[in-house]
């Protein structure tokens, strides 16, 4: 299945919440009705959503937030299930430690899609080595940086400026002047978006 390249706001409306696919710092809530489904008048239904439907919707939402395709997502879940601890939390930690997400969390990209592009275009290094695989897992202590040739890109400078104003996660330490950051540790569940109900995804795959 190909990656979705259509209107980002449409996906947020479909999930009924801002997935921050267009900007991490500016909410879509003021621009469109997130409680209305896509369509000329917003599709409505009087039917109650089944448990399976609710679980599936939550999985779709998380896939879209992190820009992960179905096959990748299944692999992440399988790995999360193999690890000790809470499977749902393990899943979110695996997604959060993807290189494209870490680049986004450090403020080098205004969206995960933009961060993914920076990685694919070889504008990012990990521990001094050029990295171009968005799904690369970042480990505690890894240093992620913008390559010298990309430091003057307006989109990176602007994204970093906005991130500094909005604040960054406690599990990354960023030196904006050097355009680099350190992945201090895996984020705790409380440090990851609270509007995700990962237990629904665990229930879905446990069927």
From Swiss-Prot:
One of its GO terms (molecular function) is structural constituent of ribosome. SUPFAM superfamilies: Alpha-L RNA-binding motif. Pfam families: Ribosomal_S4, S4. InterPro entries: Ribosomal_uS4, Ribosomal_uS4_bac-type, Ribosomal_uS4_CS, Ribosomal_uS4_N, S4_RNA-bd, S4_RNA-bd_sf. Residues 42-53 have a biased composition (Polar residues). CDD domains: S4. Residues 31-55 are annotated as: Disordered. Residues 97-160 form the S4 RNA-binding domain. Keywords: Ribonucleoprotein, Ribosomal protein, RNA-binding, rRNA-binding. GO terms for cellular component: small ribosomal subunit. Gene3D superfamilies: Ribosomal Protein S4 Delta 41, Chain A, domain 1, RNA-binding S4 domain. HAMAP family: Ribosomal_uS4_B. Part of the 30S ribosomal subunit. Contacts protein S5. The interaction surface between S4 and S5 is involved in control of translational fidelity. PANTHER family: 30S 40S RIBOSOMAL PROTEIN (PTHR11831), SMALL RIBOSOMAL SUBUNIT PROTEIN US4M (PTHR11831:SF4). One of the primary rRNA binding proteins, it binds directly to 16S rRNA where it nucleates assembly of the body of the 30S subunit. This is Small ribosomal subunit protein uS4. The gene is rpsD.
């Amino acid at each position: 299945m190909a990656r979705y390249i259509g209107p980002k706001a449409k996906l947020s409306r479909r999930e009924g919440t801002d997935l921050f696919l267009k900007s991490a710092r500016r909410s879509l809530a003021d621009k469109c009705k997130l409680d209305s489904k896509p369509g000329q008048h917003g599709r409505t239904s009087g039917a109650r959503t089944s448990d399976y439907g609710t679980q599936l919707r939550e999985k779709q939402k998380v896939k879209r937030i992190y820009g992960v395709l179905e096959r990748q997502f299944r692999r992440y879940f399988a790995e999360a299930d193999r690890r000790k601890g809470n499977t749902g939390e393990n899943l979110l930690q695996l997604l959060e430690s993807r290189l494209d997400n870490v680049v986004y969390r450090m403020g080098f990209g205004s969206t995960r899609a933009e961060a993914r592009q920076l990685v694919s275009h070889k504008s990012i290094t990990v521990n001094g080595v050029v990295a171009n695989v968005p799904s690369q897992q970042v480990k505690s202590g890894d240093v992620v940086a913008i390559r010298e040739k990309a430091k003057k890109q307006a989109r990176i400078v602007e994204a970093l400026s906005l991130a500094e104003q909005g604040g960054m996660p406690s599990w990354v330490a960023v030196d904006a002047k050097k355009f680099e950051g350190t992945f201090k540790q895996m984020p705790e569940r409380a440090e990851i978006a609270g509007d995700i109900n990962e237990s629904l995804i665990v229930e879905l795959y446990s069927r």
